[in-house]
Amino acid sequence: MSVKRIKNLVKQLNEYRHAYYNQDAPLVSDAEYDRLFDELKELEEQTGFILSNSPTQTVGYYPVSELAKVTHPIPLLSLEKTKLISELLDFMKGQEVLFMLKLDGLTTKLIYEDGRLIQASTRGDGEVGEDITHNIPAFLNVPLTIPHKERLVITGESFIPTNDFERLKDTLRDGNGKPYKNGRNFASGSVRSLDPKNCIGRCVRFLPFNVLEGMEDVPFPDSRACKLEGLTHFGYCPFFSISGTGLSKEYAEKFIQELVSTAANLHLPIDGIVMIFDSLSYSKSCGKTGHHYKDGLAYKFEDDTYETFLREIEWTPTRFGEIAPVGIFDTVEIDGCDVS
């Protein structure tokens, strides 16, 4: 029974991932996806049965658009998630950490050489992304040239501020001729457009969260915070708070609340907070899986609740010959998805 459930969850979650990453049309809310993902992960740990295409082993989804493909020499992976501050504190292990905004947008990589932006790409499945260099001139805050001649590779999030999305959402349509229901889909559809004209005027912005290559001339090259601060000389504006080594629950909550307030004041779309080690050498020693790096955690906010009406229970036979109850309730919109 557990193996059958694992196979069903993998199939279901991969369908959801394809719709989310390649079609910009999520089929379920983030909360529902996370619930199913956690169930799959727990079953895999209990049984030791893990399929090669399990979402727990990979990140994102292989891009299938007509955009040119870009290979990432350094994989752009995700982070493990938690909803408990106590798990953040246990994870620190006496190390200094950064608290950063977890923006709800599209992970993007920028490459500069000889002071010029030469390539921009999406994360894709972490190994292969899409070339979106042609759309970068439409971004509002990405410099095309910088006073830095060495190679520089930075990753961050492409997004549309919440106030701009509210202003624009009723004036534009997605590929199916329907209004965009959430800012993440709007940003993704804009950034991944084949025609740069579709990205112009959509208020797309970029916020860096990591330096993958370069910036070795900063005072403390092993410090993630120091490298991020160095990006301010090139016009970027990262937001983070750095902790000491003995962080209490009260201070962790304070860091998180300050960042949440900053996001609200600046209309930044967020779905959590990232906690990651400041020391780059220590981060590297933590290792990784096929899905996530082990040098940080993504703190997810508590799920929102929505009211609807349960109309009836239907008993439906499955393809395995079992009879399963199905609750029929009124459609409710969650995270821009019509859930029924």
Predicted regions and their residues:
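Phosphate/adenylate-binding "loop-and-lid" substructures adjacent to NTP/NAD/dNTP-binding pockets
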Residues: 1-146, 166, 185, 191, ...
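A residue-level signal for beta-strand positions that form part of recognition/binding surfaces
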Residues: 73-76, 96, 117, 151-153, ...
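Long, charge-dense accessory insertions within large macromolecular proteins
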Residues: 86-89, 162-340
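Two-metal-ion RNase H-like nuclease active-site motif
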Residues: 97-99, 154-156, 270, 310-313
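Surface loops and adjacent helix of pleckstrin homology
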Residues: 111, 122-123, 157, 170, ...
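Arginine/glycine-rich "motif VI" loop of SF2 helicases in the C-terminal RecA-like domain
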Residues: 144-148, 199-200
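Long, non-coiled-coil amphipathic alpha-helical linker/lever segments
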Residues: 148-161
